[in-house]
A protein has these predicted regions:
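Terminal targeting/leader modules
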Residues: 1-119, 137-162
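Amphipathic alpha-helical interface segments used for dimerization/assembly
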Residues: 124-136
């Protein structure tokens, strides 16, 4: 059976003190690193910040998403897109899924998901770029016939169209 190219990664979220009267802290996507394994855990805790790492995410490259990977790989800063949800009890955010496809991330956002992006580490960006180079073929543009080939009826307005 054909195996799809997959990389495992860990997502890091950070809670930082906010200088605001409406909120005392704010969460943000801090980074994505090669998978460290194990369970979600706190990796940094100070009076001003809390960082949690969430291991065990996979990004798999699919041929039908090749255009989305191409758009990402050819951008100035290739990124990992992470869908983030909020725990109903603690109200803390947690990463739900990750992708390298611009198009897939856009579909998630269209569906109401909160999606953040973070720069992909160099090896991950190179891996995606090599896959795109080997697998992505843009769809050929359909040539439009010049209007001169439509004949007189297609170029001239009909009596009732004036």
């Amino acid at each position: 059976m054909f195996e799809k190219p997959t990389r495992r990664l860990s997502v890091i979220l950070a809670r930082e003190t906010a200088e605001s009267r409406w909120e005392d802290h704010r969460w943000q996507l801090l980074g994505v690193v090669p998978d460290v394994g194990g369970e979600a855990r706190v990796i940094v805790e100070t009076s001003e910040t809390l960082q949690r790492i969430f291991p065990g995410f996979e990004v798999t490259l699919y041929r039908d998403e090749a255009e989305g990977y191409f758009l990402n790989a050819s951008s100035e800063t290739p990124s990992v897109f992470v869908s983030i949800r909020q725990d109903e009890e603690s109200e803390d955010p947690y990463p739900f899924q990750a992708t390298l496809s611009y198009n897939e991330a856009a579909r998630w956002m269209d569906g109401g998901e909160k999606v953040d992006r973070v720069v992909a580490w160099p090896d991950l960006a190179a891996w995606m770029g090599a896959w795109v180079e080997a697998n992505y073929r843009p769809e050929p543009k359909k040539r439009q016939r010049p209007r001169s080939f439509e004949g007189k009826e297609g170029r001239l307005r009909k009596e009732g169209d004036r």
